[in-house]
Amino acid sequence: MKITAEMIKDLRQKTHAGMNECHKALQQTEGNIEKAIVFLREKGIIKAAQKQGRVTSEGITNIVFAGNNAFLYEINSETDFVSKNEHFQQLVKMLGEIILKKQLSNVKDLLAFNYQNKTVQELLFEKTSVLGENITLKRVLKVTKKPQESFGIYKHQGGRISVLVVLKNDCPSVSEDIAMHIAASKPQFLTPDKVDPTFLAEEKKILHKQAAKELSDKPAQMIEKIIENRLGKMLKDMCLSEQPFVKNADQKVKDYLKANNTDVVYYVRWEMGN
């Protein structure tokens, strides 16, 4: 029997299941809507569909890499308990293998990818049914380095925070230390000259407004000096190169890197849920 778009639409409205699931259910039941509903219930798909809108505020970030390419990805669940479940952990590993093998660098392509006769979206749907919580893929990012550069990776609390660093050369111990520093210190920019001009202009505007209230009795030249000092202190806290190194507070990160004849080309810090 031919399965029409109208039949699929009708079943979707009744069950809130996905289009592919509805199409398969109708094929299995020769177009019988009532039997298709029973089929979806038996597969646990209707329950999973009902969970799809629920908030996923827990989960795991992870990093996989091979050669010159690395990928960060985040998978979410509703509770921390489920994110530690063996089924969830297996899903994280499986998605990492798919991402790396097929070099998939965005959520849309990954969800649509067919793995063992099922799309990744359908696999997530199945896990939602098994685990009893909404399971979602939040984001994917690809980072490519030059052949002479190296990756450094650090994961905190089993993937609640994941950091990827690209160094200009191969320094395994340094890359791990810097990745750990970034996880702890949360720098927003690599160096002062890499600060987003729009962000800088906005911060200066805020500092000027604050100074106008606090320092109205001071000369304009002094106010400008105070603003520049405050801005400098803020950038010191926000720029990786200017931060005190987490393993030696007397040494700036840039000095630690210089002492080891290397430098950070790029970094990314992901925190679960952010």
Curated annotation (Swiss-Prot):
GO terms for cellular component: cytoplasm. Pfam families: EF_TS. Keywords: Cytoplasm, Elongation factor, Protein biosynthesis. Coiled coil: none annotated. The keyword Metal-binding does not apply. It is found in: Cytoplasm. Belongs to the EF-Ts family. Associates with the EF-Tu.GDP complex and induces the exchange of GDP to GTP. It remains bound to the aminoacyl-tRNA.EF-Tu.GTP complex up to the GTP hydrolysis stage on the ribosome. This is Elongation factor Ts.
